[in-house]
């Protein structure tokens, strides 16, 4: 089932329309990005413009490099790469071997916000390395090239305090032959790894993605706190996320059309899975592929309350070749520590009925509250 997300009026998404308290992310992130005193506002029409703006912000007035950046940035992106996205859509199996395209934000800790205008689009990714205090909003990422070069849409490495909000990320949930595992399609939508923590992923529309996202790079990269809320995952294969250790709070998400596995809690991680809507999903909550060091979960007030609901919502399960744990009894296997931030989740039914009006791009950053559920 495809969720058709309605749009608000087209045109520029004005910075003046942004909430004044960007730090209220509804999750572990507490960043204002570049929305702080002393910020410089720039407009970018292309990927290269964004690269140039960020590199310029690393230098002082005398052209000397400043550690962590010279000033905070607010970058408004108004480019349109629909033609590249359409060409990639018409040549899915040719994208893997192409050069990856992306903006790398490296060693920039002064704060940066990248926000797309309504109607903008990108056939390139944004990759964060050893930075902090970054916000990415209202960006539409489609059919990233360069899967063989780790061409993620959003990659967060060694970067704490990040907010990924109101974006659309899409490709084709499809396998092309060509490698030993027959996986020559696209890389991840959002990978969060290498000691990155305090990240909030909210109000994104992610569809047609095979490998949605990592939480952790390896069995030793396990210490992080992440929140996923009010996201729509539609026609996706797996990794919602693939969680290696740490803590994940997933609330008010809509999971539909999961073709392999959903929240995969591994390496003794724990997930609080709260007031979500699951439908047409295979292995929506599981711990698999490791064979040991299983993670645990606390299931709280989702639309599924017991195995008696599986048939109603078309929830199915299968086995793994290694030892595994599925939530086939739909019982909690752990207790999540108290959540250190305030949040106001709506009912799963409201998520099902209303979230499409708020998640994704061109929504002027609107949020879903209980008042909108009636």
Swiss-Prot record:
InterPro entries: Pec_lyase, Pectin_lyas_fold, Pectin_lyase_fold/virulence, PEL. Residues 1-22 form the signal peptide. GO terms for biological process: pectin catabolic process. The keyword Signal applies. Coiled coil: none annotated. The active site is at residue 239. Pathway: Glycan metabolism; pectin degradation; 2-dehydro-3-deoxy-D-gluconate from pectin: step 2/5. Gene3D superfamilies: Single-stranded right-handed beta-helix, Pectin lyase-like. Its main location: secreted. The keyword Aminoacyl-tRNA synthetase does not apply. Its cofactor is Ca(2+). One of its GO terms (cellular component) is extracellular region. It catalyses: Eliminative cleavage of (1->4)-alpha-D-galacturonan to give oligosaccharides with 4-deoxy-alpha-D-galact-4-enuronosyl groups at their non-reducing ends. Keywords: Calcium, Disulfide bond, Lyase, Metal-binding, Secreted, Signal. Disulfide bonds join 93-176, 350-373. Binds 1 Ca(2+) ion per subunit. It is found in: Secreted. Ca(2+) binds at residues 150, 152, 187, 191. Its EC number is 4.2.2.2. GO terms for molecular function: metal ion binding; pectate lyase activity. Pfam families: Pectate_lyase_4 (PF00544). Belongs to the polysaccharide lyase 1 family. PLADES subfamily. This is Pectate lyase 3. The gene is pel3.
């Amino acid at each position: 089932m495809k969720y058709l997300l309605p749009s608000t009026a087209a045109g520029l998404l004005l910075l003046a329309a942004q909430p004044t308290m960007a730090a209220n992310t509804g999750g572990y992130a507490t960043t204002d990005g570049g929305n702080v005193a002393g910020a410089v506002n720039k407009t970018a029409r292309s990927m290269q413009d964004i690269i140039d703006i960020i590199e310029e912000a690393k230098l002082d007035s005398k052209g000397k490099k400043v550690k962590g950046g010279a000033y905070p940035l607010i970058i408004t992106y108004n480019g349109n790469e629909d033609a590249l996205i359409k060409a990639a859509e018409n040549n899915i199996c040719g994208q893997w071997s192409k050069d990856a395209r992306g903006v790398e934000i490296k060693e920039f800790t002064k704060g940066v916000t990248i926000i797309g205008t309504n109607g903008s689009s990108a056939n390139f990714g944004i990759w964060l390395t050893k930075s902090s205090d970054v916000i990415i909003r209202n960006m539409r990422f489609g059919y990233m090239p360069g899967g063989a070069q780790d061409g993620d849409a959003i990659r967060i490495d060694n970067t704490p305090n990040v907010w990924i909000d109101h974006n659309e990320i899409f490709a084709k949930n499809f396998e092309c032959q060509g490698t030993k595992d027959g996986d020559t399609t696209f890389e991840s939508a959002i990978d969060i790894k290498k000691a990155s923590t305090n990240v909030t992923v909210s109000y994104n529309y992610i569809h047609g993605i095979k490998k949605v996202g990592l939480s952790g790079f390896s069995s030793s990269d396990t210490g992080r706190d992440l929140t996923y809320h009010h996201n729509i995952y539609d026609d996706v294969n797996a990794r919602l996320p693939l969680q290696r250790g740490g803590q994940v709070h997933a609330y008010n998400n809509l999971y539909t059309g999961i073709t392999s596995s959903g929240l995969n809690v591994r390496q003794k991680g724990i997930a609080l899975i709260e007031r979500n809507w699951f439908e047409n999903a295979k292995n929506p909550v599981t711990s698999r592929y490791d064979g040991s060091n299983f993670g645990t979960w606390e299931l709280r007030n989702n639309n599924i309350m017991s195995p008696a609901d599986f048939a109603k919502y078309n929830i199915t399960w299968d086995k793994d070749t290694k030892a595994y744990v599925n939530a086939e009894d739909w019982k909690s296997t752990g207790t999540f520590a108290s959540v250190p931030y305030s949040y106001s989740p709506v009912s799963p039914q409201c998520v099902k009925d209303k979230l499409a009006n708020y998640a994704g791009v061109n929504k002027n950053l609107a949020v879903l509250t209980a008042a909108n559920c009636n």
